[in-house]
A protein has these predicted regions:
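Conserved beta-strand -> loop -> alpha-helix junction used to position metal-binding or nucleic-acid-contacting
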Residues: 139-153, 172, 430-451
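Helicase P-loop NTPase motor core
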Residues: 50-53, 83-106, 329-332, 338-431, ...
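Short glycine-/polar-rich loops that comprise or flank the Walker A/P-loop
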Residues: 37, 107-111, 138-141, 296-299, ...
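Conserved P-loop NTPase-based nucleic-acid remodeling module centered on helicase motor cores
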Residues: 109-202, 214-218, 378
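Conserved helicase NTPase motor core
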Residues: 13-45, 50-53, 72-84, 96-97, ...
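Post-Walker A helix-loop "phosphate-sensing" segment adjacent to the P-loop in P-loop NTPases
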Residues: 60-69, 107, 134
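C-terminal accessory regions
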Residues: 554, 629-803, 808-814
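Conserved helicase C-terminal RecA-like lobe
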Residues: 216, 220, 404, 418-430, ...
């Protein structure tokens, strides 16, 4: 027979479940109530993970550890009886009158850290917490932000402990490339042999693992030695410019916490609870960061789905979520498998595909929604017919199903597929947006304005200084700038400091007035900022005018008006930041600008069709989704085939793509596709042909006169290479063919696939010694047929390994 204490605890927990169970399913309730210790929530696609994050955070603030707290000492039978009777009350009354009696160590809002991967996710959490708590002051005190934005706050506070000034600036991908290009030139290393992007990737990969230049230790490889030299020079350049790149932001924060006991103690004591969203996308540095931050209380909750880990190319490792229970042996694991987004048919297809991955947490999505429509599988002649088929379907659904344009999304595997769709949509007049095209902040005029702002904030930023010193033209030549750089290096000063005192240096005598005029102008504006006279928006406006940038654009006439409009929109963005920030500062605005992403700019209410890569679509959902290019060599990609790890990632990407669809999913492929300047006849993707059950597919028959022969079947290689000639008229002329929808438009029988010999490509066996015009001599590791070409993997003597298409590589046997 249960004791009074056990009855009390059971009655209390029953009351909590009655209240929260009205809005959450049982596993979601489990996650909300599990407040203490490590917690891994495996949240399948569309399973309500954000709801759980928000409700759990609100629960911590309202009730603390109320659900699991033991019965008070000396509890009486009457008290237990009251609780057991209270179960008959309506949930609203229980929440209002009974639950507050159980509050146990509620958590102050500022002691909760919620880390996300996008600003949009952080904003949604804050907004939903406000709605849940009903108290703006409380909701605003929760620290919610991206990994980078949270770490920037930490670094500003303790920058001096790691050798930086708090006014440090942040270098983005383009800035990083510019610095590396200059370093390669200084070191006399050809950017053809060692491209800046290759070095950038190597540096990022090292920093993601919390490693520096010393980690590149292959002394026998000239390429590795060069990368290390560039890496070392790059870090020195960043230090001299008081700048950090994106990877440094995480790495330097870990360095701070590991080397500064004061900082570690401060943040471990400050944050009683650490919550991490999208944990499957974390890299080793982020794993270590969250481990350090939660090391005091060990109250860490991570939410994610290993089946949606799709960012290995950015350094993410699925191992973090797969081995979380090994890193935290006492953790509790809760699975959210009920989907609130898609139909049964769509989920069945997603489950079928992902089940072919072996190294994963076992889970299976299910839903209470209906079966829904089968997945529509369509074949078209080529990429242009594919795009027109999508447009025809959208046009028909707008009429027949009264949809909005925003209900549709076209998700493609690679950006290069966007061209055919962009052309077709432009001709059709259908409103559309391409997410992932040129970002607003990548426009030249915006990058120039951002550079001016960074110079105001951090005069030591030589990279930004060189970008705008002649924007607009000021008559300061390259030789003069080289002289400034030499003096700065010799005297351990920033280039800005040398320019400000140019009159002291005879080498700068001729150009000194222009240099001093520039720095005097910038110093005057900086003084106004420091004196509180200029907000970020008014600062941009003053820089736009005082620097002469506006006059330069105005002189360009009507052609430059869009650039003026862009800067004015930038000013508007700064004004919006000022209205929502509690304490608007230039540093705060610059952090927001530096850390914005494409998805953060996505507007779900804009009534237009969205075109984007599958990677960009993660976290989004649409009533109708089109997946073009579901073909071998594209999805999965050619270079992933043959690698178990890369194929597993491609399959996870397919799972993500399928689960973006709420109501209808269209999968498209072509008989021939031109991509990267070549035309290939790619087979239907294995993800569809062999992994999705045929019973889930609606396979459209081509028009009757072009029907494929029954033998073989569509899903088993019978693609229909014959057609029946229309019955002739009595006068002997052919009968007219009936007009067909573009979705099922007539296609010619597929042409025999060309083999490598047709193109005059010579096959080299593995082990063959070859020469390449740029990369030098090397040894063929493997050769794979690729739709009429050969994909070679060659290990070059320089130490690099390249995958090259034979047609373009023009390898010579030696």
């Amino acid at each position: 027979m249960p004791t009074l204490e056990e009855r009390y605890l059971a009655a209390k927990q029953h009351l909590f479940r009655k209240v929260y169970g009205a809005r959450l399913n049982p596993p979601q309730c489990d996650a909300v109530f599990q407040t203490e210790g490590p917690l891994l929530v495996l949240a399948g696609a569309g399973s309500g993970k954000t709801t759980v994050l928000v409700r759990r955070t609100a629960f911590l603030i309202r009730y603390g550890n109320a659900y699991h707290a033991p019965a008070p000492s000396g509890v009486r039978e009457e008290e237990v009886g009251i609780l057991e009777t209270a179960a008959e009350m309506p949930p609203e009354q229980i929440e209002r009158e009974i639950l507050p009696l159980f509050i146990d160590h509620p958590c102050p809002p500022w002691a909760i850290l919620a880390i996300t991967f996008t600003n949009t996710a952080a904003k949604e959490i804050r907004e939903r917490l406000l709605a849940e708590l009903g108290d703006e002051e409380v909701a605003s005190q929760i620290v919610a932000g991206t990994f980078h934005s949270v770490c920037v706050r930490f670094l500003r506070r303790y920058a001096d402990r790691i050798g930086f000034d708090p006014s440090f600036t942040i270098y983005d991908t383009d800035d990083k490339k510019r610095v590396l290009t200059a370093i390669l030139k200084d070191l006399n290393i050809s950017d053809k042999i060692l491209p800046p992007k290759t070095v950038a990737n190597a540096i990022s990969a090292a920093k993601d693992k919390l490693q520096g230049p010393e980690s590149i230790t292959d002394a026998s490889s000239p390429r590795a030695r060069d990368i290390r030299r560039v890496f070392e020079a790059y870090q020195k350049k960043l230090q001299a410019c008081n700048a950090l790149d994106f990877d440094d932001i995480i790495m330097k924060t870990v360095e701070l916490l590991e080397s500064c006991p004061e900082a570690l103690a401060y943040y471990q004591n400050k944050f009683r609870y650490v919550l991490v969203d999208e944990y499957q996308d974390t890299n080793p540095a982020q794993f270590r960061l969250t481990e350090l931050l939660s090391g005091g209380s060990r109250n860490i909750m991570v939410v994610g789905d290993d089946d949606q880990s799709i960012y290995a190319f950015r350094g993410a490792t699925v191992k973090n979520i797969l081995s979380f229970d090994k890193a935290y042996p006492d953790c509790r694991v809760i699975k959210l498998e009920q989907n609130y987004r898609s139909t049964k048919c769509i989920l069945a297809a997603a489950n079928a595909v992902i089940s072919h991955n072996s190294d994963r947490h076992d889970k299976k999505l299910w839903c209470d929604a209906g079966e829904g429509e089968k997945i529509h599988l369509r074949e078209t002649e080529d990429q242009n017919a594919e795009a027109r088929a999508v447009i025809d379907t959208i046009t028909a659904q707008m009429v027949l199903k009264h949809r909005h344009y925003r209900d549709f999304a076209v998700l493609y595997r690679v950006n290069e597929m966007a061209r055919a769709f962009e052309t077709a949509f432009a001709k059709s007049g259908i409103p559309h947006r391409i997410l992932g095209g040129q970002r607003f902040y990548d426009r030249k005029e915006i990058r120039d304005m951002v550079a001016y702002l960074y110079i105001i904030m951090n005069p030591a930023d030589n990279l930004r200084l060189l970008r705008v010193i002649n924007e607009p033209r000021r008559g300061i030549g390259d030789k003069s700038l080289d002289a400034v750089a030499e003096i700065a290096t010799a005297e351990a000063l920033s280039m800005y400091e040398v320019m400000a005192h140019a009159n002291r240096y005879t080498a700068l005598a001729r150009v000194a007035p222009k240099l001093v005029e520039f720095t005097d102008m910038m110093n005057e504006i900086r003084t106004a900022v420091e004196g509180g006279e200029l907000t970020p928006s008014s600062l941009i406006e003053r820089l736009f005018i005082r620097t002469g940038y506006r006059d330069m654009l105005t002189a360009g006439g009507e052609a430059e008006k869009p650039r003026i409009d862009a800067v004015e929109e930038f000013i508007t963005g700064a004004s919006e930041y000022e209205s929502r920030a509690e304490t608007p500062t230039l540093a705060g605005f610059m952090e927001e600008v530096a850390l914005v992403s494409d998805v953060d700019k996505y507007d779900a209410e804009a009534d237009s069709v969205v075109l984007m890569t599958i990677h960009s679509a993660k976290g989004l959902e649409f009533p109708v989704v089109f997946l073009p290019g579901m073909e071998e060599g594209i999805f999965p990609g050619a270079q992933s085939i043959g690698s178990e790890a890369e194929m597993a990632e491609e399959r996870r990407l397919a799972y993500v793509a399928i689960t973006r669809a709420k109501e209808e999913l269209y999968i498209l492929h072509t008989r021939e596709r031109m991509l990267y300047g070549r035309t290939n006849a790619n087979p239907l993707s294995r993800f569809v042909k062999t992994e999705i059950p045929e019973s889930l597919l609606d396979i459209a028959d081509p028009p009757r006169s072009f029907a494929p022969p029954r033998a073989g079947g569509y899903m088993h290689g019978g693609y229909g290479q014959g057609y029946r000639t229309p019955t002739p008229r009595p006068d002997g002329t052919p009968a007219p063919r009936r007009q067909e929808s573009e979705l099922y438009r007539r296609v010619e029988p597929p042409k025999p696939q060309k083999n490598a010999a047709t193109f005059g490509v010579v096959r080299f066996a593995p082990g063959t010694r070859v020469r390449h015009a740029t990369f030098g001599t090397g040894t063929v590791r493997s050769a794979r047929d690729m739709g009429g070409d050969i994909l070679y993997e060659v290990a070059f003597d320089s130490g690099m390994t390249k995958k090259l298409m034979a047609t373009y590589a023009k390898l010579q046997k030696i």
